[in-house]
Amino acid sequence: MAQFYSAKRRVTTRQIITVTVNDLDPFGQGVARHQGKALFVSGVLPHEQAEVVLVEDKKQYARAEVKRRLTDSPQRQAPRCPHFGVCGGCQQQHASVPLQQQSKRAALGRLMKREVDDVIAGAPWGYRRRARLSLNYQPKTQQLQMGFRQANAKAIVDVVQCPVLVPQLEALLPAVRECLSALSALRHLGHVELVQADNGPLMVLRHTAALPATDREKLERFSQTHGLSLYLAPQSEILEHIHGEAPWYTSDGLRLVFSPRDFIQVNDGVNQQMVRTALEWLDLRPEDRVLDLFCGMGNFTLPLATRAAHVVGVEGVPALVEKGRENAARNGLSNVTFFHENLEEDVTRQAWAKHGFDKVLLDPARAGAPGVMPHIIKLAPRRVVYVSCNPATLARDSETLLQAGYQIQRLAMLDMFPHTGHLESMVLFERRLT
């Protein structure tokens, strides 16, 4: 979700003031009022009073840092992670989960000018099945740093635990660090990516120089000992599969094989609920033709095909289109057609646009889908489900449907990333009958 402030920074005197926070924004910042404008203060919750130092003063808003908290909210909780406040991964571990969801729900409602009907959430801890950890060898200490970037900085926070990771990946962290620290090429390691597939964990190691045979042997032994699939990435475009079987996950009971480079939702529990909700909202009938835009490798497309007459998936990444086709065949689905097309170009010239559809689902990236919204109107589907990772572009694109006579029937906030400022959502639009 983007913030809309762009005025030039104004010099402050680092004045110390006492404020009472009355709201929490979706990013976990406390919101107070000072001299008639919003004052954002990280680390302070609604109804808490604090002494703060003004550090930024703009025409429409100001920012401050906490000097001393004077009162505590009953919604305050002790952060579970020892790295919270330094690591840039989480911003809201100090706030209760109900408060986090309430603030995100309120922000979504304000943008959409409508009450939020549902909050779709899963486990608040141990939910993340994918993580990329930066690696950096420190010559002075002769130690390998492994962790996440600091908030608003490039420095690496060495992590020994991460409670938002699924337990299988969190348990691997010490062993991965020990293994990588024992490599002779540890000065040439870029990052390590860990993914928990349904058939076990996998590790991708990015290295910037060739690994000697002894290092490759150590890594292969490590992957065998810990039952994980191993991939090496000597270049960003190259992926070498060293050990283990291809990873897969399930979506509505279907098995989707993926490459470590492919996009998958990091929160499996919420993803499963999201897919089921989309299927329910679309109210699919056996005779329906369904269009799935920005379909990826078929996270929605394939489950849709188990309930509809025919499904068309459109995606801009060639590798994902190929994976979608392979997974359709693997699951015995012959009523699916995938198209590789750039949906930011003139879609009216694309082959899929010549077909008619009864229902449409779209799941675009943060930029939204301004280029395809007019064509969706021309298709005149009875129902449209829009899944969004950016409520600002969702609100913009929704106006196109609303002005064309569609109505919002359901609005849900997806708590895909607890303890962070990320806000995802999904909306059901239905065409008004004339």
Curated annotation (Swiss-Prot):
Q: Name one GO biological process term.
A: rRNA base methylation
Q: Which UniProt keywords apply?
A: 4Fe-4S, Iron, Iron-sulfur, Metal-binding, Methyltransferase, rRNA processing, S-adenosyl-L-methionine, Transferase
* Catalytic reaction list: uridine(1939) in 23S rRNA + S-adenosyl-L-methionine = 5-methyluridine(1939) in 23S rRNA + S-adenosyl-L-homocysteine + H(+)
Q: Name one GO molecular function term.
A: rRNA (uridine-C5-)-methyltransferase activity
Q: Which residues act catalytically here?
A: C389
Entry's CDD domains?
AdoMet_MTases (cd02440)
Residues binding [4Fe-4S] cluster are C81, C87, C90, C162
Class in the EC hierarchy, top level: transferase
Q: Where is S-adenosyl-L-methionine bound in this sequence?
A: Q265, F294, N299, E315, N342, D363
Q: Does the keyword Transferase apply?
A: yes
Domain TRAM, first and last residues per copy: 10-68
This entry's Enzyme Commission designation comes to 2.1.1.190
Annotated family? Belongs to the class I-like SAM-binding methyltransferase superfamily. RNA M5U methyltransferase family. RlmD subfamily.
General function of this protein:
Catalyzes the formation of 5-methyl-uridine at position 1939 (m5U1939) in 23S rRNA.
User: What name does this protein carry?
Assistant: 23S rRNA (uracil(1939)-C(5))-methyltransferase RlmD
Which organism's genome codes for this protein? Klebsiella pneumoniae subsp. pneumoniae (strain ATCC 700721 / MGH 78578)
